[in-house]
């Protein structure tokens, strides 16, 4: 899994959730936001990698949300990109 792909997926998840931890987002919405076809297998793999890093979590309903660490990382990435 490339770091670039992880960054794109984290950014999409954060933007769709309003950068708020715990706001559930569907995989299909993330796929659309990153320009992938529906049910692209890379997205669940990317989300699982983000989960392993403590940046995203899978809800019981199959939707994903940012963790507080994920929201903080996204803000840091945005601050860095804005320099």
Where are these regions (language model features)?
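Short alpha-helical segments that sit at the start of domains
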Residues: 1-21
């Amino acid at each position: 899994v490339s770091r670039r792909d992880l960054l794109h997926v984290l950014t999409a998840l954060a933007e769709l959730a309003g950068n708020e931890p715990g706001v559930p987002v569907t995989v299909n919405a993330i796929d659309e936001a990153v320009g992938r076809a529906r049910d692209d297998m890379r997205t669940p793999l990317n989300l699982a990698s983000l989960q392993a890093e403590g940046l995203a979590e899978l809800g019981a309903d199959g939707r994903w949300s940012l963790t507080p660490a994920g929201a903080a990382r996204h803000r840091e990435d945005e601050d860095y990109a804005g320099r």
